[in-house]
């Protein structure tokens, strides 16, 4: 939905060292010039869709789930329009899933930055594998939880109805992560995801409007 950091976000996804994925970008009738940004990337992995009308302004979770329904791969990520992935994000996640193929949830370790790009905080180092109870323990004691850091097993995610729909999407991402954690959780040892704290972010201004893209690998 927002154009300010979109190019940087797309670039971080396309520059993954693991190249076997599809990037689905959904324009939720943004007033910004999203088209020009997307069309500046000449990459066959991009699928660009435009909603017929704005959905996220009235039901953010409905828009998230409609985005996820476009995925066809084994795993999915619902990326945002202002966060950044390290080049080895997908490689680190893939290596963990090869070791623990029955796990359906992998959060990438997070750091947060401000609008100028300066680091604000970074998450602690957690065990590579956590049973659900341990994941809940760490989550209740300050583990950073951001929707776009999570990799989901797509089949399990869709069978369970996708993101849990709470009013204004508050804590929907955390509740969905817990729902998906019953088979355990994997955590990358390296910081591979950068969350931008911004005045135009959903957590910054209270707006429920937010455009979401998706990686499907």
Kindly give the residue locations of the regions a language model identified:
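Conserved short acidic donor-positioning loop in nucleotide-sugar-dependent glycosyltransferases
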Residues: 13, 28-30, 41, 55
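A conserved acidic beta->alpha catalytic loop
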Residues: 27-36, 53, 80
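Short aromatic/hydrophobic "clamp" motif used to bind/position activated sugar donors
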Residues: 76
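The conserved acidic donor/metal-binding loop of glycosyltransferases
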Residues: 80-84, 109
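Conserved donor NDP-sugar-binding/catalytic core segment of glycosyltransferases
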Residues: 88-121
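Conserved nucleotide-sugar donor-binding catalytic segment
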Residues: 130-212
